[in-house]
Each structure stands twice: as C-alpha cells, then as structure tokens.
C-alpha cells in the first residue's frame, strides 16, 4: 500500500532507530495508486478485482485473477503493476517459495523500459504515475533487503516525474495521492532525521500539513485503491510519527471493517495498542490476529504463523505472557 533506518524487517512496526529514517523516506513512495476539477482514474474492473482479493488477504485468488488478465486487452502496464503489488504481498506474507526480489525487479524494469525513453513532459498522467510507482517499488525492495545505497539511487530517478505530479496535484487523483505522500513524509524525514537534508536539497519543497490534508481528502475518494492506501498511511502516520493513537485506531478499524480478514491491518491494530500502552486490549487483538490467521484462505503454515510470531515476540519484549 505504500510508504532510511529499519524498514519493516517484515511489515511490522518494530523498527530500529538507526534505520527508522529509511521507513519514513520510503513511505511516501509506497502506494497502489478531490475536488470537482480533479480527474478521477478508472482502472479496469478486472484490475480492481485483483487488488480486492489482495486486500481480503486471499492471495491465491488474486493470483488466479491476475493470470486471467493476460488474455485480455488491458494495458500491459496496469497488469504489470498489479503483478508487482501481488508479488509484494506474497513477500511480506512470509512466503519463501519464490525469489520475489528477482521477480519484482524483472517486472518493474520491463515497465520502465517501455516508458523511459519518452521525455517526461510528453508522458500521459498515468505514465508519469507509472514511472514514479516503478522506481519507488525498486526502492521498496532494496530497502526491505537492506540495499540502502542502491535504494537511494532509484529514488533519485523519480525526481523529474515527481515534480510533474506535484505541480499538477489537483488535476489527477493519483497525483494528489503522490503529492500527499511526498509532502508529508519528505517534511517528516527532514524534521526527524537531519542527515537526509542533503538528499532533499535538490528535491521539491515539502509541507507536512498539506500532505496530511491531501491524504485525508484521498481517504474519502470512491476509488478503492486510493481510498485504501490513504487510510493505511494515515493509520501509520498517526501511530508511528504523530503518536496519535486514538486516530490511528480509527483508521485501523475502518480498514478492518472493509477487509476483516486482512492480517496486515489486524497486525497494525495490535501494534497501535502496544505502542499506546493498552496491554489488555493488545492481548485481545493478539488473540484476534491468531483467529484471523487460522481462518485465512490459501496460506501455508509459514504464512499463517508469520505475523503471529512477530506479534508474540513483541508481547514477550513488553513482558506480557502471550499464553494468558
């Protein structure tokens, strides 16, 4: 969904302070994809169905729906971006059966090579978004695997495309999403981690408050890709950066109401409660996480236990007995 220091060694919220900056810097590039003048994007319903299965955490179903896309006339870039998102969900689910790093890199570079020789100012709005998305995902994989310097190089490739999106924020819903993520996380990174000031010296200016407001607007849109990713990042912003735990819980509950079987959302609700010091509620959410994990369709034993095990370690670290 979407966004310097410990990126989730999984998708956890457990970070190591030295690497925390990487997570903030990365977050504004992690998204799947206003007002009356804003052009609303409309992905084909078959693409939406793939994402819907991912959000429901039914990854085998998403895989079947993705494979069916190749026999349609749908734009190949849309198919490839859906493919990359699905590979990412498999990776963070804890699955070890495929080389997701290599698979994602191959697909992303294939998309980039289709577009990279066209001058940025001659691209369609969707092609600009596609290039931002692809370079961002390359960075996402690099940081996840702790290849930080390679990740920074990929981030730099986004700047020409990013500037177009920022200058046209209100023209296109995906640009509004990009602008919200960039403005918030770039400003937050510089404020919390001054070591990154040189990186942003040549980057567009950022406004933390503007970013938050744009993400809030995006969270109210009808496009489920923009709505869900905005809700997800507002949840993470509120508990990881703003320490506004009640607001974070509100967004977590919205996501869980929409997708009650999504283990990622349940895990983050657990982390919010832990970080807020609400240990009895965190323990109850841990139990709920185990229940949902047990019932989730099509997962192997490693995937079923992946987030539960991380949550269990967090409980033990907080001196809470998971068996109680």
PLM regions: where:
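TPR/TPR-like (Sel1-like) alpha-helical repeat modules
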Residues: 203, 209-213, 280-295
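Alpha-helical adaptor scaffolds
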Residues: 216, 220-246, 253
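Short coil/linker segments at helix-helix boundaries
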Residues: 43-45, 60-63, 83-125, 129-171, ...
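Short coil turns that delineate tetratricopeptide repeat
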Residues: 74, 122-123, 169-171, 223, ...
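Bacterial Sec-dependent N-terminal signal peptides
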Residues: 1-46, 278
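Extreme N-terminal leader/anchor segments
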Residues: 35-80, 86-102, 106, 117-120, ...
């Amino acid at each position: 969904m979407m966004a310097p220091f410990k990126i989730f060694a999984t998708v956890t919220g457990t970070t190591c302070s030295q690497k925390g900056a990487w997570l903030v810097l990365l977050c504004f590039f992690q998204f799947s994809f206003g007002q009356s003048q804003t052009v609303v994007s409309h992905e084909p319903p078959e693409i939406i169905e793939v994402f819907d299965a991912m959000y429901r955490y039914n990854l085998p179903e998403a895989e079947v729906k993705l494979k069916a896309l190749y026999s349609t006339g749908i734009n190949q870039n849309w198919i490839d971006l859906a493919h990359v998102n699905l590979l990412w969900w498999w990776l963070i689910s804890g699955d070890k059966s495929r080389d997701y790093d290599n698979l994602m890199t191959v697909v992303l570079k294939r998309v980039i090579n289709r577009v990279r020789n066209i001058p940025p100012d001659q691209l369609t709005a969707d092609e600009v978004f596609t290039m931002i998305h692809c370079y961002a995902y390359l960075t996402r994989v690099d940081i996840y695997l702790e290849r930080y310097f390679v990740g920074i190089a990929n981030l730099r490739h986004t700047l020409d495309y990013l500037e177009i999106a920022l200058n046209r924020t209100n023209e296109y819903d995906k640009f509004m999403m990009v602008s919200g993520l960039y403005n918030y996380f770039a400003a937050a990174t510089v404020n919390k981690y001054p070591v990154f000031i040189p990186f942003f010296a040549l980057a567009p200016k950022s406004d933390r408050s503007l970013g938050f407001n744009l993400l809030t607007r995006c969270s109210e849109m009808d496009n489920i890709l923009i709505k869900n990713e905005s809700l997800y990042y507002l949840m993470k912003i509120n508990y990881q950066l703003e320490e506004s735990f009640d607001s974070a819980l509100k967004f977590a509950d919205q996501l869980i109401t929409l997708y009650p079987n999504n283990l990622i959302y349940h895990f983050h609700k657990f982390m919010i409660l832990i970080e807020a010091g609400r240990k009895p509620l965190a323990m109850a959410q841990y139990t709920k996480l185990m229940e949902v994990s047990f019932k989730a369709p099509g997962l192997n034993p490693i995937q079923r236990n992946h987030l539960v095990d991380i949550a269990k370690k967090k409980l033990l670290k907080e001196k809470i007995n998971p068996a109680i």
